[in-house]
């Protein structure tokens, strides 16, 4: 039997412990409001939280039927530029700590000209101040990591995938808009009000 590698960014297990175990009771209460867990899953109740439809397991739940657990990573990604090949597919990693999550990373598949920006650049502005009470994200660092993504992978990327959003094609022609959006995100989320 062959083991499947489970990859995670540096610091992932520490962040899982601090964010999900220690803060979970407060998070669970706030998440019930943030994700409208008390509403029925129908046209007059809950439809979407912006990420997409909610799974319907048994009753009004946010996960499919079954159990949830954590399998610890078998390999920790320690630096940007680290390359690993799994089943003949090369994966190049960019660490992006403190962005959408305290331990986060993007993945570039050079042979497929595909960049996965994780949850760092979805179709919506993602969780700078999570309502459930998670750590406030650093908008400036987030914008800098997106700019680094553009510098590292922009000229080599034809396909862009993110979580919670449609894939995008013909990206080499679309990157001209990207820096403007990153700057706008940084400016609008960090300047003082008033």
Where are these regions (language model features)?
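Acidic, His- and aromatic-enriched active-site or binding-groove loops in soluble protein domains
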Residues: 2-16, 106, 183-193
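Short, surface-exposed, polar/charged, turn-prone segments marking secondary-structure boundaries
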Residues: 7-11, 33-37, 44, 120, ...
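Active-site HxH/HxHxD metal-binding segment of metal-dependent hydrolases
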Residues: 1-73, 77-79
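Active-site neighborhood of phospho(di)ester-bond hydrolases with catalytic His/Asp-centered motifs
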Residues: 1, 7-10, 96, 116-118, ...
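Catalytic core of the metallo-beta-lactamase
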Residues: 18, 56-127, 132-140
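Divalent-metal (often Zn2+) His-rich catalytic cores of metallo-beta-lactamase-fold enzymes
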Residues: 114-115, 124, 140-194
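Short secondary-structure boundary/capping segments
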Residues: 2-4, 20-27, 131-133, 174-183
């Amino acid at each position: 039997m062959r083991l499947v590698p489970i990859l995670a960014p540096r610091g992932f297990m520490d962040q899982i412990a601090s964010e999900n175990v220690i803060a979970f009771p407060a998070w669970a209460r706030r998440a019930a409001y943030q994700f409208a867990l008390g509403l029925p899953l129908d046209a007059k109740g809950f439809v979407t939280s912006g990420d997409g439809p909610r799974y319907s397991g048994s009753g009004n739940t946010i996960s499919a039927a079954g159990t949830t657990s954590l399998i610890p990573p078998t390999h920790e990604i320690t630096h940007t530029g680290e390359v690993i090949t799994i089943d003949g597919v090369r994966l190049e990693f960019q660490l992006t700590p403190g962005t959408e999550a305290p331990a986060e990373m993007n993945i570039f598949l050079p042979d497929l000209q595909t960049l996965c920006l994780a949850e760092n650049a979805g179709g919506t502005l993602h969780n700078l101040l999570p309502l459930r009470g998670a750590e406030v994200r650093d908008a400036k660092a987030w914008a800098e990591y997106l700019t680094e993504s553009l510098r590292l992978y922009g000229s080599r990327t034809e396909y862009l995938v993110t979580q919670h959003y449609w894939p995008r094609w013909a990206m080499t022609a679309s990157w001209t808009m990207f820096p403007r959006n990153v700057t706008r995100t940084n400016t609008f989320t960090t300047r003082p009000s008033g």
